């Protein structure tokens, strides 16, 4: 059985007048993430990790920010399309480990719901999904509350025809 690894990263600036959506969860906060879609930084990092695992490019190539079809789109739909392409090539998720980097808001109360959302979107057991959050101890753009970043590492495994 072939196992492949993918790594993804995404970042979006925090701005007033936008909803903060991370991992498909709307989080009460005074600012939201700016982007062409709903700017779900976690879903974007995971999508890039999936694409990287099979050398399929990145989400910017697949869903360009100058394409009006994707303006304001739910990033869960983008992630589902990416995962459909992974499955189409004979692979499925083995394990996902992600970390969100944000000084504020505190994300711990929302992590379990993010994991549940991902388990449903990716049709896998929640035990295969790890999501964590951390701060930068006040350092850098995240520490200054200018933006939020996410990193994701995944392994995908080849789906065997008879087993």
From Swiss-Prot:
Pfam families (UniProt xref): YgbB
SUPFAM superfamilies, per database record: IpsF-like
Binding site for a divalent metal cation: 10, 12, 44
EC class of the enzyme, as a word: lyase
Binding site for 4-CDP-2-C-methyl-D-erythritol 2-phosphate: 10-12, 36-37, 58-60, 63-67, 134-137, 141, 144
Gene Ontology molecular function terms on file: 2-C-methyl-D-erythritol 2,4-cyclodiphosphate synthase activity; metal ion binding
Catalytic activity entry: 4-CDP-2-C-methyl-D-erythritol 2-phosphate = 2-C-methyl-D-erythritol 2,4-cyclic diphosphate + CMP
Site (described: Transition state stabilizer): 36, 135
Co-factor binding comment: Binds 1 divalent metal cation per subunit.
Keywords in alphabetical order: Isoprene biosynthesis, Lyase, Metal-binding
Pathway: Isoprenoid biosynthesis; isopentenyl diphosphate biosynthesis via DXP pathway; isopentenyl diphosphate from 1-deoxy-D-xylulose 5-phosphate: step 4/6
SUBUNIT field: Homotrimer.
Family (UniProt): Belongs to the IspF family.
Function per UniProt: Involved in the biosynthesis of isopentenyl diphosphate (IPP) and dimethylallyl diphosphate (DMAPP), two major building blocks of isoprenoid compounds. Catalyzes the conversion of 4-diphosphocytidyl-2-C-methyl-D-erythritol 2-phosphate (CDP-ME2P) to 2-C-methyl-D-erythritol 2,4-cyclodiphosphate (ME-CPP) with a corresponding release of cytidine 5-monophosphate (CMP).
NCBIfam families: ispF (TIGR00151)
Name of this chain's protein: 2-C-methyl-D-erythritol 2,4-cyclodiphosphate synthase
Source organism per UniProt: Carboxydothermus hydrogenoformans (strain ATCC BAA-161 / DSM 6008 / Z-2901)
């Amino acid at each position: 059985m072939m196992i492949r690894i993918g790594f993804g990263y995404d970042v979006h600036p925090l701005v007033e007048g936008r909803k903060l959506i991370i991992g498909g969860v709307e989080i009460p906060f005074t600012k939201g993430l700016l982007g062409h879609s709903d700017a779900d930084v976690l879903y974007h990092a995971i999508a890039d990790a999936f694409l990287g695992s099979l050398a399929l490019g990145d989400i910017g190539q697949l869903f360009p920010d100058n394409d009006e079809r994707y303006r304001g789109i739910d990033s869960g739909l983008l992630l589902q399309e990416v995962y459909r392409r992974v499955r189409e090539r004979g692979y499925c998720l083995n394990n996902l480990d992600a970390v969100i980097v944000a000084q504020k808001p505190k994300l711990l109360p929302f992590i379990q719901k993010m994991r549940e959302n991902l388990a449903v979107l990716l049709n896998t057991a929640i035990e295969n999904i790890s999501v964590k959050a951390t701060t930068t101890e006040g350092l850098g753009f995240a520490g200054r509350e200018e933006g939020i970043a996410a990193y994701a590492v995944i392994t995908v495994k080849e789906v065997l025809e008879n087993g």
